[in-house]
Amino acid sequence: MHHPRVRTAVAGLVAVLSLVPLAACGQSDSTAPPSSAKPATSASASLPRPKPYTGDFKKLEREFDARLGVYAIDTGTGREVTHNDRARFAYHSTFKALQAAVVLSTYSLDGLDKRVTYTREDLVAHSPVTEKHVDTGMTLKELCDASVRYSDNTAANLLFDPRAAGPKGLDASLEKLGDDITRMDREEPELSRWVPGEKRDTSTPRALAEDLRAFVLGKALRAPERAQLTTWLRTNTTGDAVIRAGVPENWVVGDKTGTGSYYGARNDIAVVWPPDSAPIVIAILSHRGTKDAEPDDELIAEAASVVVDSLSS
């Protein structure tokens, strides 16, 4: 694994160059028209040059036979790293962080003691926490904890408010936040059965990062609810091998992972706190080339390392 602390100074220089605005004028060569000629008007003349880190992401895509989407922003400087950041990907279980935020907004911390009962018939695959509490039920706070920190699928389904049309209600809440990109259509585990070309249960790296930033760093939640969401994300148990593995060890990471049933899909969205520096918001989404491909955490970790190199130089 190539961690940021062992990358070469050349990589850092390339990252710096990627953040310098392009000059307005073009370069000339021996075949260029004389100065009296009209400026070029072809489409190619107006195309932006590839960012230096784009080559790193494309190399990862080739190495892992994967499609990769990345959006990251240093909230202190506004500097961004982008790669397919406006393209659609299945979000998989990353939505659980946003869902918990909406629950916090709806009920506040004081309302999370409400107990939800359910039966064994309500259990779905990968429910390591809820399967132990069928007899007693769980509070909204316990369900959010199970959903965000353990990616418990039944907990997420129980948090979909039936009075607000389930997933569509969450979709509407995100639209009120300003996100008209993310589509919430199905519950677990069906939402993880995405196939290429499908728009259901998809978003973009940019949209997910902007949502996460609004909830964790912005004013979408009151301070007590924002602190609780941050605690859940920072104590997530499923993210050690993804974004956390691609940033320096002394950086604090709060994240929510996602894994698809098909095409080796693996995602992670995170807020990262470098020491003595403003937070960085990162969303990395991916899927691989064949339906039976396995997810590979290394792809996400390596992509996170590219992000850190590009923003830290």
Curated annotation (Swiss-Prot):
Residues 1-26 form the signal peptide. GO terms for molecular function: beta-lactamase activity. Coiled coil: none annotated. InterPro entries: Beta-lactam/transpept-like, Beta-lactam_cat, Beta-lactam_class-A, Beta-lactam_class-A_AS. The active site is at S93, E188. Residues 28-46 have a biased composition (Low complexity). Keywords: Antibiotic resistance, Hydrolase, Signal. It comes from the Bacteria. It catalyses: a beta-lactam + H2O = a substituted beta-amino acid. The record marks K96 as: Increases nucleophilicity of active site Ser. Residues 28-52 are annotated as: Disordered. Substrate binds at S151, K256, T257, G258. NCBIfam families: bla_class_A. The class A beta-lactamase family has a specific amino-acid numbering system, sometimes called Ambler or ABL numbering and often misspelt as Amber. A multiple sequence alignment was used to derive a consensus sequence and then the consensus was numbered taking into account insertions and deletions. This allows use of identical numbers, e.g. for active site residues, despite differences in protein length. UniProt always uses natural numbering of residues, hence there appear to be differences in numbering between this entry and some papers. This is Beta-lactamase.
